[in-house]
Amino acid sequence: MHRALAVPLVVLAFYALRTPAVLAQVCVADQHGGLVCGEGSAAMRVVDDTISPSKNYAFAWRGAQGLSVGDPPPPGVENLLIRISDGAVLAKLGGEYWATGEMRANRYELVAAWSPDSRSVIEVANSRWDSDSFAYYRIDGAAAAKLDLRALVEPVMTARLPPRKRQGNSFSVRTDRPLTLDARGRLRFTAMLYVPKSEISNDYEVRVNIRTTGGKPSAQVVSMRRVRAD
């Protein structure tokens, strides 16, 4: 049986980091049907299934030596929020996912959940055991403001556990469950605290309200409900 949990009002506000867009080059299709922006060491490749509803923005990746990959994987991988029309970089993301159309990072994933108006996006960058980055980005012209959602949600989830079970857990947003952000900034998702390589998992359905005032995003956890781990 699902058990509803009372959640104290938790508010997290950050100074809006507004990064001026850094221009690259126009994005064009490559031989694998993906979009590549720029050339040489400055080249970036759009990550599949991360393009905004407006088709104006997307997540992309680049390496310190461009997009060439081999064995070992490319060094210095960065994930980015870009504008597709001119390849402008609006923000640096927190993950290290890469994919060329032929190969991709093993046990990494990068997921985007866009608002219907394409002005806001949620980043989920998962590695094998953790969500390395779980963040909200608000686009305003040539700048993007970032809000760290993991820093908000994980402590609230941890506080729900008995004290003896609060240590040694990994935090991960479940990308196999619905992850939605509506036009009013209401975010819904499922996350878990679990012990790697064990069957111990504490899963929660979470609702967070996000708002932006004066270019500064803030958020609050409005509900958290324990659910069965699948």
Where are the predicted features?
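Positively charged n-region of N-terminal signal peptides that target proteins for export
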Residues: 1-4
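C-terminal segment of classical bacterial N-terminal signal peptides
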Residues: 14-21
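Short N-terminal edge-element motif at the start of the domain
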Residues: 47-113
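Beta-strand C-termini and the immediately following turn/loop, strongest in propeller blades
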Residues: 61-65, 71-72, 123-128, 190-194
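Short, solvent-exposed loop/turn segments at conserved positions within beta-propeller repeat blades
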Residues: 71-77, 127-132, 199-203
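Residue-level detector of Asp-centered blade-edge/turn motifs that repeat once per structural unit
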Residues: 116-117
